[in-house]
Amino acid sequence: MTYDFDKIIDRTGTESVKYDLRKDVFGKADVIPMWVADMDFPTADFIRDAIIEKAKTDVYGYTFREDGYFESIVQWIKRHHQWETKKEWMAFTPGIVNAINLAVMGLTNEGDKIIVQPPVYHPFFYAINNHNRTLVQNPLIDTDEGYIMNYDLLEEQAKTAKMLIISNPHNPVGRSWRKEELIRLGEICVNNNVLVFSDEIHCDLVLPAFKHTPFASISEEFAQNSITAHAASKTFNLAGMATSTVIIPNNNLYKKYVDFIHSTEADLGNIFGKIATKAAMENGDEWHSQLIDYLNDNIRFAIDFIHKEMPKIRVHNPEATYMIWLNFKDYEISDDELNRKMVFEAGLGLNSGHIFGKEGECCMRMNLACPRSVVMKALKQMKNVF
């Protein structure tokens, strides 16, 4: 079956954060929204059909996640990432941001140092600061070939840290970390008893010619010193289902984490989240394959257009995610002026780079998970200003 990713869907009036909050966020309601990391493609038919079938039941009472739910995730990860997991390592969380917050609250103490690698997904900062932990920033290094990790600084920071939260693949810069990069990071963390929380929500959005390496798959030592977060929400556009999974091979760590989840009553979930996830994991291979090809074409088109028509914008070829990270520093304008021009002159709603850390000043994150015609229109509007 061939899936249609060119179809335009009007999401206005659906309580969509991405569309219906444009006026609140940007001060202008008619910008093309390319900010929030969800996709504008139709929900896959096999997911929609599974939800509709469940909706036909007469009672929407409390449910649990049966073995088949977790087994579908085990098999997906095995097929796509060659990592042999076990359902006994898995636990439900109501979204990965929740999973990170639960890990911070349940596995660290107030004042503990937690390392992140900016520019990075901004809820990492909130999870640390909001719970009175100490934020330690290990900024990535921007090179001509792309962003790399600062291991020398990490060696020093790890000596007094309790946890490191890694974005693997990295949001927003689009790196799919190589095995050797993760090995070096993992060895530093193991040697200093720093627990690794690996947010792998974008693992199924790695582009052709690149490969995702699950952090915990590298060695038993890394598996025993890590929590991996996985979800179908980015890949199959199910963010509204608030459903994700943590994978914890260490029995003692698993028990401590799951006991804390129980103590917060955050483990009930919802009926349709588990139905949608299981349908995606069991039936989504072909849809996923076509999605990756379409996203890759969108990204290639955008990168080529920018290099040709707006060469002052610096942009690396992403290896994963459906976002591109745009650097406007050569325009020598302020962050505020960049945002004003993008919204009120170009008519585009992108994520301001500064939310990902000070390293993102005068940068922007652009979401390309939309029909090609929208990408083309947006880039032409950007060209008229930049």
Regions found by a protein language model. Name each.
Residues 222, 332, 341-350, 356-386:
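PLP-dependent enzyme catalytic core of the Aspartate aminotransferase-like
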Residues 255-261, 280-303:
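Structural signature of PLP-dependent enzymes
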Residues 131, 191-192, 222, 346:
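Helix C-cap/helix->beta junction micro-motif
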Residues 105-166:
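PLP-dependent aminotransferase-like
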Residues 141-210:
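Active-site phosphate-binding strand-loop segment of PLP-dependent enzymes
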Residues 218-256:
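Active-site PLP attachment segment
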Residues 2-95, 102, 281-282:
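N-terminal small-domain helix-loop-helix segment of the aminotransferase-like
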Residues 278, 294-303, 315-327:
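Conserved glycine-rich beta-strand-loop-beta hairpin in the small C-terminal domain of fold type I
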